[in-house]
Amino acid sequence: MAGLKEVRERIKSVKSTQQITKAMKLVSAAKLKKATSRIVTMRPYAEKLQEVMSNILATTDMSELSLGLNEVRPVQKLLVVVMTSDRGLCGGFNSNLIKASKRLLSEKYADFNKKDITILPVGKKANEFFKKSGYEVHEDFVNLFQDLTFEGSAKIAQFIVNSFLAKDFDKVEVVYSKFKNAAVQEFMCEEFLPVAKSSSHASSTKADYMFEPNKAQLLEELLPKIIKTTFHRYALDTNASEHGARMVAMDSATNNAGDLIKRLEIDYNKARQTAITNQIMEIVGGAAALEA
């Protein structure tokens, strides 16, 4: 069994670590509250905008539109946006996002040459991983989460739109974490461009709308806004998921530290009791020897 001094130092060290993890948990909880508030604030606007577009697309022959952003062409160049956090200590959050992106590439794009795939990392952990992976990495937007704003998200979305319209890429995929609650994150891979016709967001109410100006002009105005809003939603979800994952990880670490402290205190008491018992036995033995 370890000596008294060694156990005492270990208890002191674990208590110090416990204070750090508890503080990090509280900070993450505060950041999570702010992040979820931003999601709730933006969601009604994003959902309504998506509903308007879906209602238009549901009654439109996409082949009649020539907006550029809905152009489906053979995929020769692929852009994959991978969102992660900048920092660790958030459990398996970053590794699960990287696994999701690797699975996307190995399953859906297994026939692609690495030189035909560009990774756009948003978050330092994604950048650190993919710089060593052999893919071309576009590093201009790594630091979005240092100061997450709509303007920052819109800048990345505009770069993606411009690149797609210039035919630098034929398809864009986004890997991000969809926020459910502090303990649950859903790791998503979604096709971002070209814009696909989808009825999942369309209103269930049947109505015959009159559009002024015409649908093509309306979509031309709406699509860039929707694309920027959608990308910002991905970023907000990932940001909230990060803080939730870190809060849970630090809570678990704090509890584990508490359990370890209890076990160490038991070891300390046992060692102390053993030392006292040995001293008593030495004294008794010495006294008996003198009497003899």
Predicted ranges, named:
Residues 1-292:
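C-terminal beta-strand-loop-alpha-helix "lid" module of Rossmann-like NAD(P)-dependent dehydrogenases
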